[in-house]
């Protein structure tokens, strides 16, 4: 195989791997009910199923910086093959967990999948940088990034499609096995085993472990296995969260003092870099809150089945890529800062509208400039999705502009890590607070039931009360999400202008 053909095969295989990892990040949000049924989780303990999302994200975030650096030391080919093998093993465990009804195996499988997926994006980005000259590199790296973003758009729809095709959610994970095998074969025949530099890169193991510990403690501290109306956190929540804060401080101190760091700050413009990452955290939190809670609103409040509720997300997911295209074009005219600010403000407006959804939402429509009307839920989700899409390109572009060229791979990964961190903490925090708020609202509602009411009438009254409590809970969650987006928009004002670029660090002769 020629060098040119070999590198195209290699980068295609890497992009396929990135797409698989991205799909599996989001695929479970539309098949949660089926998974809950097969692993024995009752509907009134829905908070337990969020672990299949949080543990995947935690593994993803913890593995990404460590394994991307490890590929500098041990070679792209070896780390890609190991990561793909791990992804296949995690997929098998997840599918078998459904077969045996084993919740703990399910969580273990998703965690292994997350760790493996966390390595695929940065290593493939680094591989693209290795195989293409700098002048031709932007298009290649953009294609890899597009595979990641495509997964976020298609993931929920992919889950619905596979379940419709095979009538079994386990095939979502079984189908990963042949696809992973194809990617591994393509990498095996297209890459040399000696694909690392002469100088072995050091790996910041301590920094990676501290970051993983900090995020893990925060997630555990926020998770309340027995939510009620009296307290948001479990009895052990506060000391565990304090431990997470201590680990975060230790991580920051280590990264400041260590010789080997996850990201070398030399030449990086810190303020705009951190501001762009902060805005990415806000965007990630909003994205995951939408993917999880819109479907639950459809099922719990509107009485839809799983497929109908997941169909609500189609409007949001259609708007995302449209917004991404418009955001990329708009950033070339108005700049990344303006597009990020405007995009997140539009997103905040969308969530403000969603926070006002009533119990009888299906009866409401919105007038579009007096010309025609569309169902309110579709219009509001389109606004939120369009706004989030607008910031995808500008945030990545703004981050790369203030980082030296040599660190573009790890900087691109940092944007994804920031977004994933927002998703992880957002779903953990709002799930904990939302369930507390639901029980609090439910305890405060009173339903007048006649003393001579039948059992069916009493059950209907209780169901109506729960539906009202759910509506009020989701209203609060989406209002908080709108506030998070406003904070992200303000951070967007601090990102770099088009004239601000990183200074390349001097290399000693």
Swiss-Prot record:
Which UniProt key words apply to this protein? Cell inner membrane, Cell membrane, Membrane, Transmembrane, Transmembrane helix, Transport
- Where is it mostly found? membrane
Cite a single Pfam family from the UniProt record: MFS_1
Q: How does it sit in the membrane?
A: Multi-pass membrane protein
Per the record, GO CC terms?
A: plasma membrane
* Protein's name according to its UniProt entry: Probable triacylglyceride transporter ML0556
Its localization reads:
Cell inner membrane
Coiled-coil region list: none
Q: Which domain of life is it from?
A: Bacteria
A molecular function annotated in GO for this UniProt entry is: transmembrane transporter activity
Q: Gene3D superfamilies this protein is in?
A: MFS general substrate transporter like domains, Multidrug resistance protein D
Q: What does this protein do?
A: In association with lipoprotein LprG probably transports triacylglycerides (TAG) across the inner cell membrane into the periplasm; TAG probably regulates lipid metabolism and growth regulation. May be an efflux transporter and involved in maintaining correct cell wall permeability. Probably required with LprG for normal surface localization of lipoarabinomannan (LAM).
For this protein, the record's SUPFAM superfamilies field holds: MFS general substrate transporter (SSF103473)
């Amino acid at each position: 195989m020629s060098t040119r053909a070999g590198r195209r095969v290699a980068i295609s295989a890497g992009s396929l791997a990135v797409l698989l990892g991205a799909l599996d990040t989001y695929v479970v949000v539309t098949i949660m009910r089926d998974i809950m049924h097969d692993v024995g989780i009752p509907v009134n303990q829905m908070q337990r199923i969020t672990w299949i999302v949080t543990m995947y994200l935690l593994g993803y975030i913890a593995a990404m910086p460590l394994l991307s650096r490890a590929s500098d030391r041990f070679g792209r080919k070896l780390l890609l093959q190991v990561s793909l093998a791990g992804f296949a093993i995690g997929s098998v465990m997840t599918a078998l967990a459904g077969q045996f009804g084993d919740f703990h195996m399910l969580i273990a499988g998703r965690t292994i999948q997350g760790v493996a997926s966390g390595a695929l994006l940065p290593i493939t980005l680094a591989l693209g940088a290795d195989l293409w000259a700098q002048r031709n590199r932007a298009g290649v790296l953009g294609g890899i990034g597009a595979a990641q973003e495509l997964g976020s758009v298609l993931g929920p729809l992919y889950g619905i499609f596979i379940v419709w095709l095979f009538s079994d959610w386990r095939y979502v994970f079984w189908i990963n096995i042949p696809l992973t095998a194809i990617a591994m074969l393509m990498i095996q025949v297209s890459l040399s085993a000696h694909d690392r530099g002469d100088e072995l890169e050091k790996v910041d193991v301590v920094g990676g472990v501290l970051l993983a510990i900090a995020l893990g403690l925060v997630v555990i501290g926020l998770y309340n296995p027995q939510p009620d109306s009296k307290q948001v956190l479990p009895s052990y929540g506060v000391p565990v969260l304090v431990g997470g804060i201590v680990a975060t401080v230790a991580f920051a101190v280590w990264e400041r003092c260590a010789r080997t760091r996850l990201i070398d700050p030399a030449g990086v413009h810190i303020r705009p870099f951190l501001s762009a990452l902060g805005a990415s955290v806000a965007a990630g939190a909003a994205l995951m809150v939408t993917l999880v809670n819109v479907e639950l609103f459809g099922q719990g409040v509107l009485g839809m089945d799983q497929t109908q509720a997941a169909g609500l997300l189609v409007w949001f997911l259609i708007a995302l890529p449209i917004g991404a295209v418009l955001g990329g074009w708009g950033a070339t005219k108005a700049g990344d800062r303006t597009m990020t600010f405007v995009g997140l403000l539009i997103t905040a407006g969308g969530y403000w509208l969603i926070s006002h959804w009533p119990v009888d939402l299906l009866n409401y429509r919105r007038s579009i400039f007096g010309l025609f009307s569309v169902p309110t839920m579709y219009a509001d989700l389109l606004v939120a999705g369009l706004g989030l899409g607008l910031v995808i390109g500008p945030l990545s572009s703004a981050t790369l502009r203030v980082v030296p060229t040599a660190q573009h791979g790890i900087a691109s990964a940092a944007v994804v890590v920031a977004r994933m961190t927002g998703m992880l903490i957002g779903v953990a925090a709002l799930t904990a607070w939302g369930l507390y708020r639901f029980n609090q609202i439910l305890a405060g509602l009173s339903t007048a039931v006649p003393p001579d009411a039948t059992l069916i009438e009493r059950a209907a009254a209780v169901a109506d009360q729960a539906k009202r409590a759910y509506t009020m809970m989701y209203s609060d969650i989406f209002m908080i999400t709108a506030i998070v987006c406003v904070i992200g928009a303000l951070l967007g004002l601090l990102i770099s202008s088009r004239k601000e670029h990183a200074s390349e660090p001097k290399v000693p002769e």
